[in-house]
Amino acid sequence: MLPQILLIGATGRTGKLVLDEALTRGHLVTALVRKPNSSLPQHANLTTVTGDPCNATDVEKALRSTRLGVPVVIISTLGQTRTSGNPWAAPSSPARFMDASAKAVLAASEAVKRGPPVVQIDKLVVMSMFGVGDSFANLNILLRWTFNHSNMDQTLEDQTLVDQTVRNGSLPFVLVRPVILNEAEAAPVKVYASSAEGVSFMPKVSVKSVAKFLVDAASKGDWDCTAPVIAN
């Protein structure tokens, strides 16, 4: 049985691609969005729930909107934002935004496990990043300098907290660590250990490839309770 997906971050760059990929593969999808969004597709397998991803009550509402009897996988593609793509651009999201959402997801998951009715959650799949945890040591010197001297440090700090929160939670997880993102077409990915040992000097992966991998991680058990680094 295909798991159904609760998608958090469906209106973002990667989230939109995850949504399209999941629907194409036949998954039932519930998207938690902050406000009604006309950019989401009209699809028989898509349910939209309005709410705050950092509010456990709203996340619980979304989980209880899923179809009973079908296991749920939660995918989060939330990310820190800045006023532009420049690493030194001012942050436009709260400093601990992603970690607040991870905590809300875990709290809501505990609530729905108690029922009634009971919602079966198989795992939590999070789009993390290359540089978190033990992968930081394998960033090249240019990337390490950028993380240490630009506003990307807020993103790394938040993702590091998410990593810790999810590992300390009660759900099985996959913490996917994509390398440098680009807009190329989807291509096969190479999966590295969490440390990213063996990646090239300036590794790249397309956003489309990441979206496909996140949906793969939702439906397969190959990477459960790990933090795979992925690159094309």
Which residues are covered by each model-predicted region?
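Hydrophobic anchor at the start of a short beta-strand
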Residues: 29-30, 173
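Mid/C-terminal beta-alpha module of Rossmann-like enzyme folds, strongest
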Residues: 2, 13, 198-232
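SDR active-site strand-loop-helix element
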Residues: 8, 32, 74-78, 124-130, ...
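NAD(P)H-binding glycine-rich loop region in Rossmannoid oxidoreductase-like domains
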Residues: 31, 37-112
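Glycine-/Pro-rich loop/turn segments that contact NAD(P) or position catalytic residues
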Residues: 85-186, 190
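Eukaryotic N-terminal targeting leaders
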Residues: 1-6, 20, 39-42, 231-232
